[in-house]
């Protein structure tokens, strides 16, 4: 009996370490200069087989071996960070209105809807629940969440997940540095740059001069066969 318990414990430790190693490996691939690996990122997680931005959708991605999930944050009336893309809960839940008009407990009474607009048994998850699920298993890309940067970072730090999360903003380096300078060096930050807008190159130059991000998210309305700069 003791031998069985010891084997079970060892297997649990090995599984835990391998999960942590997986998240670290994904991060290293992302940051390694010249790495030709292709990373798979799931937009709002596995929204085809589960409600978007739900725990089940993220769990599916982990089981499929996806490298990174992209999520969006909103804040409840009582200050909890939750996963929600839209400004209202109308499209993705059985409720109506803005998430900031409800407490977390009130939002839990609604059910998430799937991609075909049908009610499911799933509820809106908190950001902390998501990071606890993702810890050591998958990278997390917080797309809409800059408004809650400090609160999100506090949750990441609390759960030991600062190294596997990407935060983003469509703002110049000077502003991001002024607002969150101490945090920028402790996590991965990805600038979002709208190439069609005036001053886009200046924004990129500002980041390159001071922090050299591992990547940029570039937004554009049209492309050309080659760069015409």
Label the model's feature ranges.
Residues 1-23:
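Bacterial Sec-dependent N-terminal signal peptides
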């Amino acid at each position: 009996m003791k031998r069985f318990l010891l084997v079970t414990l060892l297997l649990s430790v090995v599984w835990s370490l391998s999960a942590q190693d997986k998240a670290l490996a994904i991060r290293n691939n992302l940051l390694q200069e010249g790495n030709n690996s292709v990373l798979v990122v799931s937009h709002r997680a596995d929204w085809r087989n589960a409600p978007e931005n739900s725990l089940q959708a993220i769990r599916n991605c982990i089981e499929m071996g996806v490298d990174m999930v992209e999520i969006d944050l909103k804040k409840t009336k009582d200050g909890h960070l939750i996963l929600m893309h839209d400004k209202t809960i109308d499209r993705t839940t059985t409720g109506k209105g803005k998430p900031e008009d409800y407490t977390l407990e009130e939002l839990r009474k609604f059910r998430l809807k799937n991609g075909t607009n049908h009610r499911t048994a799933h509820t809106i998850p908190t950001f902390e629940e998501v990071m606890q699920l993702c810890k050591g298993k998958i990278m997390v890309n917080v797309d809409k969440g800059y408004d809650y940067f400090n609160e999100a970072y506090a949750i990441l730090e609390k759960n030991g997940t600062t190294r596997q999360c990407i935060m983003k903003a469509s703002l110049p380096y000077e502003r991001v540095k002024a607002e969150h300078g101490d945090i920028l060096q402790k996590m991965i930050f990805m600038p979002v740059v709208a190439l069609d807008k005036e001053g886009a190159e200046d924004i990129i130059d500002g980041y390159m001069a001071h922090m050299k991000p591992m990547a940029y998210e570039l937004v554009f309305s049209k492309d050309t066969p080659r760069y015409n700069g």
